[in-house]
Design a protein with these regions (language model features):
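Surface-exposed, low-hydrophobicity beta-strand/loop segments enriched in small/polar/acidic residues
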Residues: 1-197
Length: 197
């Protein structure tokens, strides 16, 4: 039996939710969903000038792997001048962003980045490109970050481009807990596309 397969390419965008401007109170989001099929990223906040470390941001939305369909609110402390800070949660959808402690000192931009988190799915295949430096692709479950479920190394000394199809049903990204998720981490990888289903 063949299930639907979708492709996903990890990315980042530092002003996906909010372009560079001074923010007060609840802001109007430019977009809300950074990826398809329930995947997501940590939300990033960067200020271009001034110290915002005394400012808190309340970020609400749906996190990756939450099958209960309830929103989560995370309070994120702002950073110093030109510093990017990230949420702890991986958000599949952001529904609200508010400045909790007054107006930010400098202009801020709100986006996403870092590792990508995948909901319960199966990795069927992938292709990647890498530079001459040694690199790796590592997939771990959120409840066990020390034991990867998939680890691919890219050798040093050559420009690498590779495609691999995983046999049978592929690699399941989560364990017995349906609310688990998997984290895909890249080191010295130029681009990666995962085929899941």
């Amino acid at each position: 039996m063949q299930s639907d397969v979708f492709a996903i390419t990890p990315s980042s965008d530092n002003n996906f939710y909010f372009a560079s401007a001074t923010a007060t109170g609840t802001i109007s989001l430019l977009k809300s969903t950074p990826s398809r099929n329930g995947a997501g990223y940590k939300v990033s906040v960067q200020n271009s000038a001034g110290d915002d470390s005394s400012t808190n941001y309340n970020i609400s939305g749906f996190v990756v792997g939450d099958l209960g369909a309830s929103t989560v609110t995370e309070t994120l402390a702002g950073g110093e001048s030109a510093v990017t800070v990230f949420t702890t949660n991986y958000f599949a959808e952001v529904t609200n962003f508010a400045v909790a402690a007054g107006t930010s000192v400098g202009t801020i931009q709100v986006g996403y980045g870092g590792d990508i988190a995948l909901p319960r799915t199966r990795i069927k295949a992938f292709n990647y490109a890498a530079p001459t430096a040694a690199g790796s692709i590592t997939v771990t479950r959120d409840d066990n970050s020390t034991l990867p479920i998939l680890e691919i190394t890219s050798p040093a000394g050559i420009v690498e481009s590779s495609h691999l199809t995983i046999p049978e049903n592929g690699i399941l990204t989560t364990g017995s807990n349906n609310n688990n998720y998997a984290i895909v981490s890249l080191t010295n990888i130029t681009s990666l596309t995962l085929y899941c289903g």
